[in-house]
Regions:
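Short acidic-hydrophobic, aromatic-tinged amphipathic segments that line or gate anion-handling sites
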Residues: 1-2, 83
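N-terminal catalytic cores of NTP/NDP-binding nucleotidyl/phosphoryl-transfer enzymes
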Residues: 4-66
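Residue-level signal for inorganic ion chemistry
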Residues: 21, 74, 113, 180, ...
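Glycine-rich, highly charged phosphate/nucleotide-binding loops
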Residues: 62-70, 94-100
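A glycine-rich helix N-cap at a beta->alpha junction
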Residues: 69-83
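Classical nucleotidyltransferase
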Residues: 93-207, 282-285
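Phosphate/ribose-recognition catalytic cores of enzymes acting on nucleotide-derived substrates
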Residues: 197-288
Length: 288
């Protein structure tokens, strides 16, 4: 539930949780297990807007999940409370001790705080785990270090790469949607509205739909051609997706997201659709 306060003491963790990836899920599972052992509710404290964007409106974080997508994924995991904290300039100035006292202790009734292995919070993120433990003892919060999560994937010659939102962004920028899905524990997706476009594919017998992504901060994977699932009106179809500029049209800078829905020939302009990435098939396709 999305609440301003928790009505009862809880075991909590805190973070932005962009992507709600495998590492996040491992951390949240530890929160749930500790809560069950202590007979308390589980909770996580997160932010609807990236903290850096609050401080700099020009910052574009390249989100793996929009706020709405993140809430939906977190709800599926099954924590008792998902606490959305509006990050403000005032909150950004709180020290870690002030944050723990004013928000975690007094507002959210946190009894146990589970900290991700590399997570920092507080003004300038200048303090670390040992500081949080000391503050917790002073104000009545037991601070627990979560076990680290490592993947079983190998990138280059490095095995067991730690899963992070930054790693997944890097993979998507390289078009590695299958590896990204392994780290996310679900296939990456884009939501948006079908809009008019060049429609060159339609002219040569391949009807295409151009997607306008809902959130301009959502990360778009690397240019290329992808096998995707296309979902709308409660049905799912196979599709081939082309992401890239239109070099065969006018060499313009506009980047397009254009999908050919296989064995489907109806107009779906203005429809809300979801594109779910399965695999990348090649770098880029020219349609004329």
């Amino acid at each position: 539930s999305d609440l301003a306060i928790t009505p009862e003491p809880c075991v909590a963790t805190i973070g932005f949780f962009d992507g709600v990836h495998a590492g996040h899920r491992y951390l949240i599972q530890q929160v749930k297990e500790i809560a069950a052992a202590k007979g308390l509710r589980s909770a996580l404290v997160t932010f609807p807007v990236h903290p850096r964007k609050v401080m700099n409106v020009e910052y574009h974080p390249e989100l793996l999940t929009t706020p709405e997508e993140k809430i939906s994924l977190l709800a599926d995991i099954g924590v008792d409370y998902c606490l959305m904290l509006d990050f403000t300039p005032e909150i950004s100035r709180l020290t870690a001790r002030e944050f723990m006292t004013q928000l975690l202790k007094e507002r959210y009734q946190v009894k146990y705080l589970v900290i991700g292995y590399d997570h920092r919070f507080g003004h300038n993120r200048s303090e670390g785990f040992e500081d949080y433990v000391r503050y917790g003892k002073e104000i009545g919060i037991e601070v627990i270090r979560a076990k680290a999560y490592t993947s079983n994937i190998e990138i280059g010659n490095e095995p067991n790469i730690p899963v992070s939102s930054s790693l997944i962004r890097k993979l998507l920028h390289e078009g590695e949607v299958s590896l990204a899905a392994h780290c996310l524990k679900y296939e990456y997706f884009l939501d948006g509205i079908v809009v008019g476009g060049y429609q060159v594919g339609r002219k040569i017998g391949f009807p295409t739909a151009n997607l306008r992504v809902d959130d301009p901060d959502k990360l778009i994977p690397a240019d290329g051609v992808y096998a995707v699932w296309v979902t709308f009106d409660g049905k799912t179809y196979m599709g081939m997706l082309n992401i890239g500029v239109r070099p065969t049209i006018d060499n313009g800078p506009n980047r397009t997201i254009e999908v050919n829905i296989l064995h489907f020939h109806s107009d779906i302009y203005d429809k809300f659709i979801r594109l779910t990435f399965v695999k990348r098939t090649r770098d880029r396709k020219s349609v004329v």
